[in-house]
Amino acid sequence: LSAPIRRGQFDPSHIDLRNLLSKLSIKALSEDSVNISIKRLGFDEQSGFSLNRLQFKFEANRQQARLSDFKIQLPHSRIEIKPIIATLPDTLSAEHFYDQTRFSLQITKSLINPSDIAAFIPVLEKINTPILISMHLTGTPNNLYFHTFDFNFGKEDIIAHSQISVKNITNPQKRDILCDPITLNASSSGLTDIASKLPFLTEEQCKTISRLGTIHFTGNISSQNKNLTACGTLKTDLGSVHS
């Protein structure tokens, strides 16, 4: 608590909620059964983060858990998740939970404005262009497979489509991410707009990105032990590269 407050950033040591609104219903809460409805939760936090509305219904017993009616509204964002049903392991130890709890999750056309979450990721503060995201994933908390992942920045300024596998999520040393296949299209104006709003890029780096013009990439991207590898064909206004 003696640490100085980090203004403009979420600080877990100095949480300050204002304009708190909440409405919830607890129908069951025991070792064998849970039935909770958050009908509305909203607040403003000193970091600048505002939660306009969070709502969901959570039901669970020893065999399965169900999350439904899940919606999040931020000042310029809205996220909706289709009902999730998770099958639980017989033994709820941490290892069994992460490796044996199976579920399916779908997000359809949710809108996210990066500046809404700048309190957690400060570099997004100046990016006000909306992102449309859709995905369908299945798996366990430790191993996920995205059957579809669609990303649309602005008015199709940057578009990405991919199938993604993420393995060993709980073990950073063994974590493995593979996007295969992935297709990425980015317009010159879209890249220039983002680059100009990222504080860690120098003016010269922004000019270099601008000179690339329109970008098209097809192939795969993998990440393991902090090593990022891309294989495929990259086409820009300056030429093409194949690896």
Task: Enumerate the language-model features and the residues they cover.
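C-terminal, active-site-flanking charged/polar segments
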Residues: 166
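Extended amphipathic, helix-rich lipid-handling scaffolds
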Residues: 1-153, 170-242
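Conserved two-metal-ion catalytic palm core of "right-hand" nucleic acid polymerases
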Residues: 163
